[in-house]
């Protein structure tokens, strides 16, 4: 077949929401359930051809997403409703497409992204929750959210996050640029909201684990700055659990004009 006869290829971006509690992370792997595998299967059914997706951020086992962004290429010409309603009809109930947008050839869900934003939700109450048990992290000691917020501000800007980096992290550098980190209380919920150009492995969960020690008055406010300067993972607190973590937004250059739905998680005020 000559070049003139090749069918056109369309590049499509999707916004994806998922409850990660029953999945072994985003990335497709043999023998275990993954969000990527379920999404690719549903897309392939609608496109009537094999589809491979590329995501903005590969979340770990048990981690959720309300603002994940993916892209894929296909020769299938479909209406937007097919990529949203049609794909959702083929997805399990804990994964959903939130929006669809045709994108230019130079768009890449991962490499075009300029920042990622996560929210970590702590249910701070003496008694554990049931309904949201896989969507929040329970911490029974009273937490001082304002104290946590003050302690976290030393993490702003470009820093070496070795103290908050998983030992098995494969990133070439521990340096990341944190644009904001806010800790707020919403009734029994304490929310840690952090945005950075990118994250080293377990960075948010390791930061939150140490912030909870500060919030519970087990460590001074200055401890976070001391940990950052020490560049030693063994000095920081244990990694916070996966179930409280959400990828809530990914930033892209304005020229792509991607939709920006409410970030969520949707049981909280935006």
Swiss-Prot record:
Pfam families the record matches: PseudoU_synth_1
Site (Interaction with tRNA): 58, 78, 110, 126, 139
Region annotated Interaction with tRNA, chain positions: 168-172
CDD domains: PseudoU_synth_EcTruA
Listed transmembrane segments: none
The enzyme's E.C. designation: 5.4.99.12
Subunit description: Homodimer.
Job of this protein: Formation of pseudouridine at positions 38, 39 and 40 in the anticodon stem and loop of transfer RNAs.
The protein's name in its UniProt record: tRNA pseudouridine synthase A
Organism: Escherichia coli O9:H4 (strain HS)
Taxonomic lineage: Bacteria, Pseudomonadati, Pseudomonadota, Gammaproteobacteria, Enterobacterales
